[in-house]
Amino acid sequence: MSTFVQKPAEVEKKWVIIDAEGLVVGRLATVIATYLRGKHKVTYTPHVDDGDNVIVINAEKVVLTGKKYTDKTYYWHTGYPGGIKERTARQIIEGRFPERVLEKAVERMIPRGPLGRRQMKNLRVYAGSAHPHEAQQPVALDVAKLNSKNVRSA
């Protein structure tokens, strides 16, 4: 018996929707990264984009554990001398684009390369509960029920 190898033409992508309200960022990001890469399928092939399309709503209501909300710092560089910039997770979540905290967490769990960039395009993150993907009939995935530690109890 030979090893199964998925061909790009045989890939069947589904649409999955996840409500991120009250979920821990890192634990949610691992589930999303698994679905984007297709590792939850028995047909997983490392060099083929056979992951699903993932829609995340309520990204502004994600939770960070410990003191990460105030202490976690995101850095980037403008490209100019002395152009290092930084923002805390709190500043980003309370700012204009709160979904970027979750996007960065997932992006850093996906391999960096052409395949990883293609897989990241299958992720759609929305700060609120509205999304324009009703026509795709996404299947709801309840991440909170997968493990009790996925939800942060107050």
Curated annotation (Swiss-Prot):
A GO cellular-component term linked to this record: cytosolic large ribosomal subunit
GO annotation (BP), single: negative regulation of translation
Keyword terms: Ribonucleoprotein, Ribosomal protein
Pfam family, one: Ribosomal_L13
GO MF, one example: mRNA binding
Superkingdom in the source lineage: Bacteria
Family the UniProt entry places it in: Belongs to the universal ribosomal protein uL13 family.
HAMAP family named among the record's database cross-references: Ribosomal_uL13
Name the UniProt record assigns to this protein: Large ribosomal subunit protein uL13
Gene name in the database record: rplM
